Curated annotation (Swiss-Prot):
Function (record text): Probably part of a binding-protein-dependent transport system PH1214/15/16.
Annotated compartments: Cell membrane
Lipidation (S-archaeol cysteine): 24
Family: Belongs to the bacterial solute-binding protein 1 family.
UniProt name for this protein: Uncharacterized ABC transporter extracellular-binding protein PH1214
Length: 441
C-alpha cells in the first residue's frame, strides 16, 4: 500500500469519525407536538454540505418545518464542510463501501448522481414523483434527475452559477454603472478601471479547486456561447480550437485581476473580501446571496448581482436521494416528498439564496435579486445550461481531470498546455463515460 493511498484512507476515516461524532445537528431540538404512545420515534440520518453562512440557517429552518409536520421523526443531520460537497463525496464513498449509507444525502443533479446509480447504490423514486410534481417542475430539471427512464432524486432548489456579485459602495465611489456590464469584455473593462484605482477587482477563493473551474465554465459560455458550451460538454472540440484557447486566456485574465492569495481561500472567504470592501466583485453562484444576507447586508442596497453573460442561466441544482440500503427508507421517502412541496421550497430557498424549482411557488417570500432570477428562469428567452463545475454536465472522472488542469493553469498561465490536457482528458474520461447527449439550443 502506497503512502499516498494510506493517507487518503486516513483522511476519509477522519472525516467519517468527525461527522458521526457530531451527533444530531440542524433539526429542531423539541418537536412542536409530541408523538403518541403508539408512535415510535424514528431517526432520519441526513448528510449534506451546507455549513457556511446562510446555508446552515436554511437547512435548520427546513428541518424544523419537517419535524413539525412529522413529530415522530427526529432528524440527525451530519453536515460535512467543504463547498460543492468536495469532502462529503469521500465520506459517502466510505459509508457506501461499508454498506452503511445515510437515509438520504445531498447530491447535485446530473452526472454527479451517475456513480451511485451505476453501482446500484440508489433506489428509484418514481412513486415520489406525483403528477403534481411533474406538472410544476421544468422539464429540463426533471431530465437532470432521470436515468434509465427512472427518477432518482428530488430537487430542493435551483442555484445560478454565472453571477457577478458586487459591492455597491465601491461601484458608486468609482462611478461604475452595473447595467453597463452585459458581456465578459464589459466586465474586464470595469476590472481594469478598478485596478487603475488601486482596487482588487475580483475576489477568488479556489482552495477547493471547483471555484476556479466555475470561473472557467462561465468564461466558456461567455466567450463561446451556448452552442459552443454544448459542444464542450459533449466532447466535440479539438486542442487546436481557437475558441478554447481564447476561453483559457480569459480565465487567466480573470485570475490576474484577482487577489494573489486566491489558492489559500475558500469561496466564502472570497465573499468576505467583497463584504469587507477589500475586493469589488466575485464570480460565484447565488449561494453567495445567502452568505451576504447572513452577514446583514441587504440585496440591491449593500450589494448587487449581475448575470454574466446576460440571458444564460447556469444551473446548479441540489437534490436528495434514497440510498438502496437506507436504514429508514419510509422516513426518507417522507423527507423526499416534503422537499418537493411549495411549503418546503419556500421555507428553504429565501434563506439559502437560491430559488424554487417548482413553477407554482409564490415569489412573495423572495428578495429582489431572487425575484428577478425567478422571472428569468421562467422566460422562454433564457438559455438553460447544466453546470460543469458542480457535477451536472460531465462525467465525474473528467471533472476531476478538469479541476486539476484549471487549478494548475491559475498558477502556470500556460494556455497551450491546458488546452492539450483538456482534450486528452476528454478522450480518456469524458467520451468513454458519456451517458447523455446534451441539446441546449
Amino acid at each position: 500500500m502506497s503512502r499516498k493511498y494510506l493517507l487518503s484512507l486516513l483522511l476519509v476515516g477522519a472525516l467519517v469519525i468527525s461527522v458521526v461524532a457530531s451527533g444530531c445537528i440542524g433539526g429542531s431540538q423539541t418537536p412542536t407536538s409530541s408523538p403518541t404512545k403508539t408512535q415510535q420515534v424514528q431517526e432520519l440520518e441526513i448528510y449534506h454540505w451546507w455549513t457556511a453562512g446562510g446555508e446552515k440557517e436554511a437547512f435548520d429552518a427546513l428541518a424544523k418545518k419537517f419535524e413539525k409536520k412529522y413529530p415522530n421523526i427526529k432528524i440527525k443531520a451530519n453536515p460535512v464542510s467543504g463547498g460543492g460537497g468536495v469532502n462529503l463525496k469521500m465520506v459517502l464513498q466510505s459509508l457506501m463501501l461499508a454498506g452503511k449509507p445515510p437515509d438520504t444525502f445531498q447530491v447535485h443533479a446530473g452526472y454527479e448522481m451517475a456513480r451511485y446509480i451505476k453501482a446500484n447504490q440508489l433506489t428509484p423514486i418514481d412513486d415520489i414523483w406525483t403528477e403534481d410534481m411533474k406538472k410544476n417542475y421544468p422539464k429540463v430539471i426533471q431530465q437532470m434527475v432521470i436515468f434509465n427512464n427512472h427518477y432518482y432524486a428530488v430537487p430542493i432548489n435551483v442555484h445560478r452559477a454565472n453571477v457577478i456579485w458586487y459591492n455597491k459602495q465601491i461601484f458608486k465611489k468609482y462611478g461604475i454603472d452595473p447595467s453597463s456590464i452585459k458581456t465578459i469584455d464589459d466586465l474586464f473593462a470595469v476590472a481594469e478601471k478598478l485596478k487603475e484605482n488601486g482596487v482588487t477587482p475580483f475576489a477568488l477563493g479556489d482552495r477547493n479547486k471547483w471555484p476556479a473551474t466555475q470561473v472557467f465554465e462561465v468564461m466558456l459560455v461567455a466567450v463561446g456561447g451556448v452552442d459552443y458550451y454544448e459542444k464542450f460538454i459533449n466532447g466535440e472540440i479539438s486542442a487546436n480550437d481557437p475558441t478554447l484557447k481564447k476561453v483559457l486566456e480569459y480565465f487567466v485574465k480573470y485570475v490576474e485581476y484577482s487577489n494573489p492569495d486566491h489558492a489559500a481561500k475558500t469561496w466564502d472567504e472570497a465573499c468576505a473580501l467583497v463584504y469587507k470592501g477589500e475586493a469589488a466583485m466575485t464570480l460565484m453562484g447565488d449561494w453567495a446571496n445567502g452568505y451576504f444576507k447572513a452577514k446583514g447586508w441587504k440585496p440591491n442596497v449593500d450589494y448587487g448581482a449581475i448575470p454574466i453573460p446576460a440571458g444564460v442561466y447556469d444551473l446548479v441544482i441540489d437534490t436528495f436521494v434514497l440510498p438502496a440500503k437506507a436504514a429508514h427508507p419510509n422516513a426518507a421517502k417522507k423527507w423526499l416528498s416534503f422537499i418537493g412541496t411549495v411549503e418546503a421550497q419556500n421555507t428553504f430557498n429565501p434563506i439559502k439564496g437560491s430559488i424554487p424549482p417548482r413553477k407554482d411557488a409564490p415569489a412573495d417570500p423572495y428578495d429582489p435579486i431572487q425575484k428577478s432570477f425567478i422571472k428569468e428562469l421562467s422566460s422562454s428567452e433564457t438559455k438553460l445550461i447544466p453546470s460543469i463545475a458542480h457535477g451536472s454536465a460531465v462525467p465525474e472522472a473528467f471533472l476531476a481531470d478538469l479541476n486539476d488542469i484549471i487549478s494548475e493553469l491559475a498558477t502556470s498561465k500556460d494556455v497551450n498546455k491546458a488546452a492539450t490536457e483538456i482534450i486528452n482528458a476528454m478522450k480518456k474520461d469524458l467520451l468513454p463515460n458519456k451517458i447523455k447527449e446534451w441539446h441546449l439550443s
